Design a protein with these regions (language model features):
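Extracellular/periplasmic periplasmic-binding protein-like sensory domains
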Residues: 11-18, 36-39, 55-126, 136, ...
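Generic recognition of flexible, low-complexity loop/linker segments
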Residues: 32, 41, 55-57, 153-155
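Short, solvent-exposed coil/turn elements at secondary-structure transition points
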Residues: 23-27, 73, 95, 173
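Extracellular/periplasmic Venus flytrap/periplasmic-binding protein
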Residues: 1-50
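Segments of small-molecule ligand-sensing domains
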Residues: 110-179
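Active-site proximal loops enriched in glycine and acidic residues that flank catalytic Cys/His/Asp
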Residues: 46, 69-72, 93, 169-171, ...
């Protein structure tokens, strides 16, 4: 995953990403010791508990560093108290979670016990079905896109599927979608 992130970063920024791996959230403290003072952001792949620990450290030592996280940190078990501590954190996840009032969301949440990992799996299966039923259009019509439960879906000339996810931000303890 680090290599794919760096390749994309190089395309967008023209420089290498400063990628570091950690085993424990406490290891993050060492990354910022001796790091360039212009470090402005951190992208983490972590559990909610690990993210809370990392956020706590950065709030006291590097409060200007913006935190971006993967969907792994977004769990159904996250409490209002958790979100109150996560103010400013942005994370990517599927747009299906914006549709919590829809009947489809309610049905899936009910059958999965509201477990986000299972709901993501359902969304991937739904999108696979959508892609199968629109394969010819994806293959033959340049720029053709589909609105799936996991994001905007498109395919390149090799039929490699690309997906744009939704970004969310915690603002005053509430999770809100960020305009892409």
């Amino acid at each position: 995953m680090g290599n794919a992130f760096n390749v994309r970063w190089q395309r967008l920024a023209g420089t290498d990403a400063n990628i570091r791996y950690y085993n424990l959230p406490a290891d993050i403290t060492y990354f910022f010791q001796g790091a360039p003072q212009d470090t402005s952001a951190l992208y983490v792949i972590s559990s909610p508990d690990e993210l809370a620990e990392i956020k706590g450290y950065l709030d006291t030592s590097n409060p200007n560093v913006r935190i971006y996280a993967s969907s792994r940190s977004n769990a159904a078990s996250n409490t209002p108290e958790y979100y109150a501590k996560m103010n400013g954190v942005q994370f990517s996840d599927i747009p299906f979670f914006k549709q919590s009032d829809s009947s489809q969301y309610q049905k899936v949440a009910g059958s999965t016990g509201g477990e986000f990992q299972l709901m993501r799996l359902y969304a991937m299966g739904s999108d696979a079905w959508l892609l199968i039923n629109h394969f010819n259009e994806l293959r033959q019509v340049p720029g053709y896109t589909l609105s799936g439960l996991t994001g905007q879906l498109s395919a390149d000339s090799n039929c490699d599927v690309d997906r744009d996810m939704t970004w969310y931000q915690v603002q005053d303890g509430n999770v809100v979608a960020v305009a892409n």
